[in-house]
């Protein structure tokens, strides 16, 4: 822990006045986010809350909207389509295969990777705990497809035939589910501002009481 925090303290000083050309490179807010993660893992909750808040404030980021979360073409695949991602990496179509790429593992809509066979989804008991007022629930297919007008880059038959509770969170870039070099050339989130809000809330709850965490 001490070694990691020492390195992060060095990064904090070196990146203090640095503005990267894109979010593919970390900035000071990302350093604070990493420090929040380390402190949270080490159960130093007060410090975790402090650095999560510093990450939020320094990032200038805002949580995803419902429209961004459920976007058929850009959902969780385009760093420039939202203001929530603090840091990400990008796949290049020149150095990826149909199997060795993030979307091929995570997107059930993709037709080129293992995900079309493994059908990633959510456990029923966890799904049932998510309120229908929480739009994040709609990235998983309810057994009763009429509860929400699910959208996909495929067609309605694909929605109807998909397994219950299948995930449609990670989308193919531009909605291209057939060409891995296009639909799989996505951005992958490394750090999002929502994570910092969750760390702050949990850390405050652990250090100052549940009410403080709920209010965060």
Task: Annotate each language-model stretch with its function.
Residues 201:
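Active-site-proximal region of nucleotide-activated glycan assembly enzymes
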Residues 1-194, 206-214:
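Structured, solvent-exposed acidic/aromatic patches
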């Amino acid at each position: 822990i001490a070694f990691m925090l020492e390195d992060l303290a060095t990064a904090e000083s070196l990146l203090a006045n640095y503005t990267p050309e894109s979010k593919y490179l970390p900035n000071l807010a990302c350093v604070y986010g990493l420090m929040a993660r380390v402190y949270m893992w080490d159960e130093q909750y007060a410090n975790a809350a402090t650095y999560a808040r510093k990450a939020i404030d320094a990032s200038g980021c805002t949580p995803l909207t419902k429209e961004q979360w459920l976007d058929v073409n850009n959902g969780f695949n385009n760093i420039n389509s939202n203001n929530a991602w603090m840091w990400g990496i990008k796949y290049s179509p020149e150095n990826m295969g149909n199997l060795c790429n993030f979307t091929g593992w995570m997107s059930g809509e993709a037709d080129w990777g293992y995900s079309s066979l493994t059908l990633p989804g959510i456990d029923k008991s966890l799904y049932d705990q998510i309120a229908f007022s929480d739009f994040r629930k709609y990235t998983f297919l309810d057994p009763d497809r009429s509860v929400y007008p699910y959208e996909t880059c495929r067609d309605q038959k694909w929605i109807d035939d998909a397994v219950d509770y299948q995930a449609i969170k990670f989308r193919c870039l531009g909605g291209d589910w057939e060409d891995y070099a296009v639909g799989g050339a996505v951005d992958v989130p490394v750090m999002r501002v929502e994570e910092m809000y969750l760390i702050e809330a949990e850390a405050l709850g652990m250090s100052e009481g549940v009410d403080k965490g709920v209010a965060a």
